[in-house]
């Protein structure tokens, strides 16, 4: 019961923390992590568009979610622009602060989900101009994503701010803008003429492969950190869900690109039936990789639940929305696999998971509104714009290091006592 009371005060208590500040002053602490909520909202719209079992009004619900996402994305762009103009120097500080710069890709990912949602929610109700708009937006996004990703990786390598004990799953985010180029292509390919569809299929596969291989490298580094240092503090563990998305989105992208290629152009590559071969290979690869996504989901879920059951202090973070987008990939992958292997059971599982992730999304929205009201977000020292790692996080790692040192000393003493005992036995035996 004590833990329940603690969690209530941390996540649901409506008492205001700290003296009231004007919203204009609080916007100095509006960080890139806020775009994770727009990214997650766009993901919910994408899930809604793929439901296998549909009912009257579901498409209207998807349109409402899409419009809501566009609204908050516009609001966030205005807020981050206001911060950079009103408080000079915060833009350069953002780029140099590893706690904040890792979430900069979420802004591009939020835009990417908006482009992806144009096909199910705008294309059927507009004219030929929407085909051109989708195509132009896609290739502009590809160019911007490539420039941004190279710049961000160079910046991180140049500053090298991380050590093995501060490695976090969010390190995979910098490659996401390139990887999401494949996801966008898979979502919009059927809106394009055959020749343009072929270009998108080729680019989508290439970018998805790039994202997946970089993910494998970062995933190995994270596993090394988990084995040697342990899990993160409880409040940061929802970020582990980020590791779910790359294998899931890779399977989803390959499947949807294959479906689009088959619908638009049977000879997408060389050969009369190359699209059918692509669909077979895509289904095989999606089945091959979905196990990794499910494993990462289960590991993250158990870690989060275990963290919530401890007495560690937990503070809501807007970056928790990243787990919505990550799990959206797994849900959509399951739904499209059900379509590929013609299994209603798999489609039902995917739909149930989609409803579940939508409920979690609503809960996170309520937690966000509450955190803004009580000044646990958009407040000095409470967001990702801090110059250093949070003191409680550093204390957590210091505690782990002290435990490791104590354990090493105990093991050393036991070994010395064992050696001394063996020596005495040998000496007495010789006498």
Swiss-Prot record:
Regions annotated as coiled coil: none
Family, per entry: Belongs to the tellurite-resistance/dicarboxylate transporter (TDT) family.
Stored InterPro entries: Mae1, SLAC1/Mae1/Ssu1/TehA, Voltage-dep_anion_channel_sf
Transmembrane segments annotated in the record for this chain: 30-50, 62-82, 101-121, 136-156, 167-187, 201-221, 239-259, 284-304, 318-338, 346-366
Keywords noted in UniProt: Membrane, Transmembrane, Transmembrane helix
Name assigned to this protein: Putative malic acid transport protein
Residues covered by region (Disordered): 402-431
Localisation: Membrane
PANTHER family xrefs: MALIC ACID TRANSPORT PROTEIN-RELATED (PTHR31162:SF4)
GO CC term, one of those recorded: membrane
Membrane topology designation: Multi-pass membrane protein
One example GO MF annotation: transmembrane transporter activity
Bias (Basic and acidic residues): 402-424
